[in-house]
Each structure stands twice: as structure tokens, then as C-alpha cells.
């Protein structure tokens, strides 16, 4: 498992959206899709399906330049429906 820290925002949305840390860690370690941020080369987005949550796509955005990586935000991405 990759080591990571969470921003205050990430902690808040994980709690509010009832996102399990196991899901976040799974997507962080084994994404179905990886996207670079076009404006910030330090930001990366990992996207993965969560079968236990209706096969929805979980998007995890993090700063890769920090050690450990810093989770910026996490959310279920409706725009990814049918794309993974």
C-alpha cells in the first residue's frame, strides 16, 4: 500500500460522502485509469470502479511530488459512468 496523507478538504469529503478508506487505497494503488492534470504537473488523478458501491467510479486526486503523496480530494465521478 502506498503511503499517503490527506488534506483537510479530503478528510472532510471522505467523511461527508462516506467513502471507505479501503476504496481510496485500492484506487490509489491499482487504478483503472490515470489522468494527469493539464494545469498542474504535480497533480495526478487515479480513477477506479468500486463494485461494492454500484460499480461507481471513484476519483482520487493527489499531489505526487510530496512524500508521502497528499490526497487533495476524493469523489464519485458521475461523468465516468460507462467509460471504465
Protein language model regions, located:
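Ribonuclease/tRNase effector modules and their secretory precursors
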Residues: 1-84
Amino acid at each position: 500500500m502506498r503511503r499517503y496523507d490527506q488534506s483537510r478538504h479530503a478528510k472532510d469529503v471522505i467523511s461527508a460522502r462516506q467513502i471507505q478508506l479501503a476504496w481510496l487505497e485500492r484506487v490509489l494503488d491499482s487504478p483503472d485509469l490515470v489522468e494527469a492534470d493539464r494545469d498542474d504537473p504535480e497533480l495526478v488523478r487515479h480513477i477506479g470502479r468500486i463494485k461494492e458501491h454500484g460499480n461507481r467510479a471513484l476519483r482520487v486526486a493527489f499531489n505526487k511530488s510530496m512524500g508521502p503523496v497528499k490526497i487533495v480530494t476524493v469523489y464519485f465521478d458521475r461523468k465516468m459512468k460507462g467509460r471504465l
